[in-house]
């Protein structure tokens, strides 16, 4: 509100006096019932790992023997012991407040030298329960902040540190939607069916990995969202351009970005400063609101002591369209899968009300998040240690627990709703290995089974090209090479094309060497001495072979030309979550 008053023309001094001494009436957007629910769930021990820790804020002043003064804090304490133990992972989180006090006393002994003394009354200690949390609930249809949690544990005072508004932390994989996929679907020419080869990937000196270090081959954007796959996300941002992803993130209301964030790590939420919980919630509320950003607001009106309106946000609000309503719906549909098939199953609460969301963790689980929404409300929960300490990966589910339990209570008694599908959405069958139009008899005869799937599209982005990741070749049954016109026994086999080295697809790949290797076992006399046969991949039996010199080669969706070598390749499509395969990814720096 201070910024709003100064923006309205009041000086900083006037604004301060009005807020703290002016007898203002503030019409808050806070819902007391929701706030109580969020406070209770944020402080409910059953939502957290059993091994709670305690950290502390420390400050004391020492008068040195030479008469100078030096201030010591919890940060100097941490640096002191990291250096003393030669351990960069040294932590000053302890199992009880008593252990904290004992550690502080030991530190004071360790830093005091002969003739030094602690200045009386200078010591200040504030012990904090860890891990900590931040939580924001927004009504996306109005932008009103209904509840805000700045931390858990006993409140030490008024106007204290609020982790939801005052602290920037890494958003991890929750930023895949904000910094990559929203832009990719809205303006980058991508669809939920678009695929990337989930395979080893290095750009310059930076090697990107999925959180479980596995690879899934050709993987659709839908499945990459569902399973939080890093490599697919980074390759997608590389395709559409970092500048585009950065611009969209800014449009979503993320104000903490810097030019140093204009790199591929943007896709994974590896940011210079991080984001606030409030702004991340506002970004997800934009998607929930059909792509329209409404600046989060904490009040509707501010009146002076005489009842005069000083500030009015009832009908005035910073608003803009960030993404098309079709893009918002497609992202939402993919994020619904996260709760049913992906990394967010634990977050889902028992209700017929539709739910969508995205998980996020960062390197060594220093941050863990769940960002989710319903047709009613958007809520983001962050968890982590104030000093950025590591967390066990098995103990980072508490943001999902808090979100599930709080949102379940908030939605009690509300009417069952789904997200409204806008005009301009259609569905069609594609090949899940390319995201394009399937080749008849080929994409459905991949060695692993049919790769056909149905996906939703904006009507302007429905694929028209044919699959470019499948090809059918006539193979000599005797040599295993591509059949020549003289091979008497041929079989038609479907191969993958376009995979990179290290991809799981490579096992089924017809690479350039194979494509240029024609059988040399047979010549014209082979047809005289043998009864030729050809095996059709769609039929287990055999059919009479062709001897006119046009049967050999690649079979595709387009009519081929020429003799000796067959026709060219078509195109196909990448699939929706349930049919594509891909490794679960991680984000931030190693998130999922």
Q: Model regions: which residues?
A:
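Active-site-adjacent bridging/hinge elements
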Residues: 6-18, 145-159, 249-260, 378-383
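Conserved catalytic neighborhood of penicillin-recognizing serine enzymes
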Residues: 189-245, 305-337
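Short coil/turn segments at secondary-structure boundaries
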Residues: 8-22, 51-59, 237-240, 247-252, ...
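Mid-domain, small-residue-enriched loop/turn segments at the edges of structured enzyme/sensor domains
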Residues: 207-210, 241-282
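A penicillin-recognizing enzyme superfamily signal
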Residues: 28-71, 76-127, 131-139, 144-149, ...
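Soluble, non-transmembrane domains of envelope/secretory-pathway proteins that act on or interact
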Residues: 204, 355-356, 360-592
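Active-site rim segments in enzyme catalytic domains, especially the processed small/beta chain
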Residues: 164-192, 200
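Non-catalytic, structured segments within soluble enzyme domains
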Residues: 1-43, 53-71, 250, 255-256, ...
